[in-house]
Each structure stands twice: as C-alpha cells, then as structure tokens.
Amino acid sequence: MIKNKKQKSYTSVYALGQYISMSAHKARRVIDQIRGRSYEEALMILELMPYRGCYPIFKLVYSAAANASHNKGFKETNLVISKAEVNQGNTVKKLKPRARGRSYPIKRSTCHITIVLEDTSFYQQYEEYLMYLKKPGYSNENRNLTCYDTYSSGGLWDKK
C-alpha cells in the first residue's frame, strides 16, 4: 500500500473534533452553510442558526482560528474556511429496558468534523504578480464556442 505524504501548507491550519455525539447527516446540514465563507461571517451564521449541531461546530471554528493566530500568527480577519468535512464516527449501541423483560436497542451515532482555515493575506500580497503571470488576451470572451444542435440543423427530422 502506497501512502501519499502530506505536504506542509504554510497558509492553512485545521481543527479536528472527534466523537461528537451527533449524526453525520445533521452535522453536514450545518457545515454546508459555512463552507467557503470568511471566519467572522461563519461565526455569525453559527450563532444565529437554530440547530443543536451549531454549538460544537462553532467551538471547532473558534479553535481553528485560535490555532491560526497562536501557532502561525495569522490575523483572524483574513481567514476563510477552505475545507470543512464531516465523517461518520463510531455508533454506540445500548439496550433500553422495556416492559415485560424486553429491551430495545438504542443507536447513538457520532461523527468526526474537520475544519480547515486558510489565510488569504498571502494571495492579496501577490495578486498583481499573479495577474501578470496570466496570459494576456486569454478570456472566455475570446473563445469561439459554437454548439451544433442536431435537431435544429435543418436535417431530416425537421421536415414532416
């Protein structure tokens, strides 16, 4: 088995929350709302959303920002949530006692949440240089894309 070695990223930090007692499906509903947004905007959204899953995700985003400012010295205003993923964790199985000596199984699902924050100040510094590297005259307007539709081409099927 070949393992890909992870390269160090100098512009991103992450926070990982494991075994959070919530189903992965419910956590994904909240994560989809904040993916790709800035750090401050994500905190506001998480504070105002009425779901139970918002609080653990809020703590994770806040922890990732604390990692960014403490470990790498990034400013919180330049942070953007570049990657947010939810994976299914273990399912804790218990038995609930019921009447007449019976018992019903209870499944308590957990999930693992990963939040990756990226610093955008690097891109703002070198924005002019990156624009210079782009080829001049290459844009979507200059490409001539024509779609040939077989039904409106005046072929056999147009005549009745």
UniProtKB/Swiss-Prot annotation:
It comes from the Eukaryota. GO terms for biological process: translation. One of its GO terms (molecular function) is structural constituent of ribosome. One of its GO terms (cellular component) is chloroplast. InterPro entries: Ribosomal_uL22 (IPR001063), Ribosomal_uL22_bac/chlpt-type (IPR005727), Ribosomal_uL22_bac/org-type (IPR047867), Ribosomal_uL22_CS (IPR018260), Ribosomal_uL22_sf (IPR036394). Belongs to the universal ribosomal protein uL22 family. NCBIfam families: rplV_bact. This is Large ribosomal subunit protein uL22c. It comes from Arabis hirsuta (Hairy rock-cress). The lineage of its organism: Eukaryota, Viridiplantae, Streptophyta, Embryophyta, Tracheophyta.
